[in-house]
Amino acid sequence: MPLLWLRGFLLASCWIIVRSSPTPGSEGHSAAPDCPSCALATLPKDVPNSQPEMVEAVKKHILNMLHLKKRPDVTQPVPKAALLNAIRKLHVGKVGENGYVEIEDDIGRRAEMNELMEQTSEIITFAESGTARKTLHFEISKEGSDLSVVERAEIWLFLKVPKANRTRSKVTIRLFQQQKHLQGSLDAGEEAEEVGLKGEKSEMLISEKVVDARKSTWHIFPVSSCIQRLLDQGKSSLDIRIACEQCQETGASLVLLGKKKKKEEEGEGKKRDGEGGAGGDEEKEQSHRPFLMLQARQSEDHPHRRRRRGLECDGKVNICCKKQFFVSFKDIGWNDWIIAPSGYHANYCEGECPSHIAGTSGSSLSFHSTVINHYRMRGHSPFANLKSCCVPTKLRPMSMLYYDDGQNIIKKDIQNMIVEECGCS
């Protein structure tokens, strides 16, 4: 959090420095509060008068983040045709029909992916023995009950092959989902292979794979669509039948040892085609137990997934909020050396932080802030004199494409450049 605040304070501080420079009529302004971000709330609300100062602060901020003392001197710009051709060839950006360059914001996409991964749960469910031979039962964890969007789902099966096998190099393994249906409830148009069982059950082919039968190894069967349908129906139980017609010919066997399988059932399986986990030590067989690997997340509209966002300043609230501010590089005369993007979202935080919202959920992401505020409200030293500040609580990166002094084209990814949310420290 200190690094987060530092980046956020930098832009705010630049504005404060510019604002505090001696100007006619400035003597009447009162001293700034204890923290720079809080001072933003005391600045004049007339945007036209404040804009030039804010633009100067933005310029200083961008140069500082690019480690430049001054803007590059582009005296002889690269011809437009050569520039656009280089961008196309190097894949550092996209050139629109109007000739404008749109930068490939790789870092922004990575940040979105990282945020998405943080919200994704990974669940591994080991198989239990099904009600019949060559069947497996998976009971998805209660953790999965709040998940509705399947990112990936795979069933892992271990194929054991005898060393002497040379008869066949490939075998086909099929996975069928077993479903119970009421009489007449089965849809005739389902895109799957279905076999009626006493009019009460059906089987749907959910995965099929041709595998190498010359070595013992794990094989992965994708079942994302099947699990997605299961979650959409509000179910958590999955019954699978495994079929491998050529396995008996090769002597290969799929280890289908579930955690409810009894020893007498194991012995019976050894006498048949070996698909029930024939041969080998029981402990070793257990290490090859089938499992389901599921990666899933909550949907965008899930009520528990929505977290409170920081307030947007709309002119009607005085408490801590995010102020939108966009600076066009063309308007400030910087489009001659900054190729892309077309401008900078110089958002900043402003507003008051009353004690009743400081450190509360949604206004700050810091547990530390909540604890400090708890003691501050009760007048406990040394926290009694500390004041809560309106600061950035979420920042996002920005990619820039620009010329340096040597007419070289630079693409730089800058972390924590744009304020996304604000809260009270």
From Swiss-Prot:
State which residues carry a glycan (glycosylated).
N165
> Which residue stretches does the UniProt record annotate as biased composition, category Basic and acidic residues?
263-275
Q: Where in the cell is it found?
A: Secreted
- Which cysteines pair up through disulfides? They are C313-C321, C320-C390, C349-C422, C353-C424
Question: Chief location of this protein?
Answer: secreted
Asked if Secreted is a keyword of the record, the answer is yes
Instruction: Give the matching InterPro entries.
Output: Cystine-knot_cytokine, Inhibin_betaA, TGF-b_C, TGF-b_propeptide, TGF-beta-rel, TGFb_CS
Write the record's keywords in alphabetical order, separated by commas. Cleavage on pair of basic residues, Disulfide bond, Glycoprotein, Growth factor, Hormone, Secreted, Signal
Leader peptide range in chain numbering:
1-20
Which residues make up the pro-peptide? Answer: 21-309
The record ties this protein, via Pfam families, to: TGF_beta, TGFb_propeptide
Q: Cite a single GO BP annotation.
A: androst-4-ene-3,17-dione biosynthetic process
Q: Name one GO molecular function term.
A: identical protein binding
Q: A Gene Ontology CC term for this entry?
A: inhibin A complex
Region described as Disordered: spans on this chain: 259-289
Q: Which family does it belong to?
A: Belongs to the TGF-beta family.
The task this protein performs is described as: Inhibins/activins are involved in regulating a number of diverse functions such as hypothalamic and pituitary hormone secretion, gonadal hormone secretion, germ cell development and maturation, erythroid differentiation, insulin secretion, nerve cell survival, embryonic axial development or bone growth, depending on their subunit composition. Activin A is a homodimer of INHBA that plays a role in several essential biological processes including embryonic development, stem cell maintenance and differentiation, haematopoiesis, cell proliferation and tissue fibrosis. Signals through type I (such as ACVR1B or ACVR1C) and type II receptors (such as ACVR2A, ACVR2B or BMPR2) which, upon ligand binding, phosphorylate SMAD2 and SMAD3 intracellular signaling mediators that form a complex with SMAD4, translocate to the nucleus and modulate gene expression.
Its assembly, as annotated, is: Dimeric, linked by one or more disulfide bonds. Inhibin A is a dimer of alpha/INHA and beta-A/INHBA. Activin A is a homodimer of beta-A/INHBA. Activin AB is a dimer of beta-A/INHBA and beta-B/INHBB. Interacts with FST and FSTL3; these interactions prevent activin A interaction to its type II receptor. Activin A interacts with ACVR2A. Activin A interacts with BMPR2. Inhibin A interacts with ACVR1; this interaction creates a non-signaling complex (NSC) that inhibits ACVR1-mediated BMP signaling. Inhibin A interacts with ACVR2A.
Write the protein's name. Inhibin beta A chain
